[in-house]
A protein has these predicted regions:
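Exported/periplasmic cell-wall-interacting domains
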Residues: 5, 9-16, 51-57, 62-142
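Cell wall/extracellular polymer interaction/catalysis modules
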Residues: 1-52
Length: 142
């Protein structure tokens, strides 16, 4: 996939079931699963340098469709889903080559809107740097 690309297809997926979101920093890809079925994927931006995106298992703790950063000069963060107490979030962004965030996971805004519509407080977000799990291996908390 290229920068700015995303796909969303719920065909055949269960109508309910746990939402699990995975982010692979190395591949620069987010995948969204519902009831074990992948329903969405997008190319992501991530934090680099002094503000890297943290790795680990997080839960969505806050949602705000029209959020603006209180740390970075009121920068728009549409469809924000907070992961950490210090502000790391998933949010809509212009996903372009050479861009980065201040630690957040940026996804194309139309994709963020779809994700925001199905994600609930407490849903799990797993952020890795190229790690994979075999069948039956547990997901370890950060």
């Amino acid at each position: 996939m290229k920068f700015g690309e995303w796909h969303w297809d719920e065909t055949g997926a269960p109508k309910d079931g746990a939402i699990v979101i995975t982010v692979d920093i190395k591949a620069q890809v987010m995948s969204v699963f519902r009831g074990g079925w992948e329903i969405g994927t997008a190319v992501v931006l991530y934090g680099a340098g002094a503000t890297p995106t943290p790795l680990g298992v997080f839960h969505i703790t806050q949602k705000d469709a029209d959020h603006h950063s209180n740390i970075y000069g009121g920068a728009p963060m549409p469809y924000m889903m907070r992961l950490t107490n210090d502000g790391v979030s998933i949010h809509g962004d212009l996903v372009a080559d050479g861009w980065a965030t201040h630690g957040c996971v940026g996804v194309p805004t139309p994709f963020a809107k779809k994700l925001f519509g199905i994600a609930k407080l407490g849903d799990r977000v797993i952020v890795t740097n190229g790690e994979t799990l075999g069948v039956g291996q547990p997901i370890k908390a950060a």
